[in-house]
Curated annotation (Swiss-Prot):
This is Urease accessory protein UreF. It comes from Pseudomonas putida (strain ATCC 47054 / DSM 6125 / CFBP 8728 / NCIMB 11950 / KT2440). It is found in: Cytoplasm. InterPro entries: UreF, UreF_sf. UreD, UreF and UreG form a complex that acts as a GTP-hydrolysis-dependent molecular chaperone, activating the urease apoprotein by helping to assemble the nickel containing metallocenter of UreC. The UreE protein probably delivers the nickel. One of its GO terms (cellular component) is cytoplasm. It holds the Pfam family UreF. The keyword Transmembrane does not apply. Required for maturation of urease via the functional incorporation of the urease nickel metallocenter.
Amino acid sequence: MNSDLALLRLLQLASPGLPVGGFTYSQGLEWAVEAGWVRGVDSFAGWQREQVHDTLACLDWPVLARLYHACQAKDAEAFGHWSRFLLANRETAELRLEEQQRGAALARLLDGWQLGQAPAWRASLELTQLGGMAWLAAHWAIPLRQLALGHGFAWLEGAVMAGVKLVPFGQQAAQTLLRDLGADLPAALDQALALGDDQLGGGLPLLAIASSRHETQYTRLFRS
């Protein structure tokens, strides 16, 4: 696949229009706002920046890299291992359910394209969204670094759009947040890709608490 087409495929994978339901989740932000932990643009930026460095760089991106390499090597066993590892590191029932629902939605998209149908791969593809993204990126010859940055920006954009509704703040502030927080992504990715297998894993106690409390929050805009 030529580089122009690979770029277009990456934009498709990173698009908020990808039918995986990402816009329906707040990943604990809704409770954090209600609890007063996130009160404005500055505290929102701090909330997201911690996730970039402690979750995205220490868990999601390193696992994405291993899933991608497993796809390139046609190693379904390793792909399944890292898919289960990622799911096990989602710290709450809500976060695990979100991961599985996103993964199942992307797997259905693959079904529609008659891709990823081999039994050795199909069950693992349903477990996580990152698994489907890695599989398609390897299939479409999207370079790993571009895949990771596209995924990171899509995640960040979803969080900022949730912040617009919940904190709230306006579109000017939203674009400034995307500009400023997005500038952290390349260095965080360098850190992520340098980690060994025994260094993987990250957790934020307040995020886990917020997600757990969101499961029973009385009034919610976002899915649990």
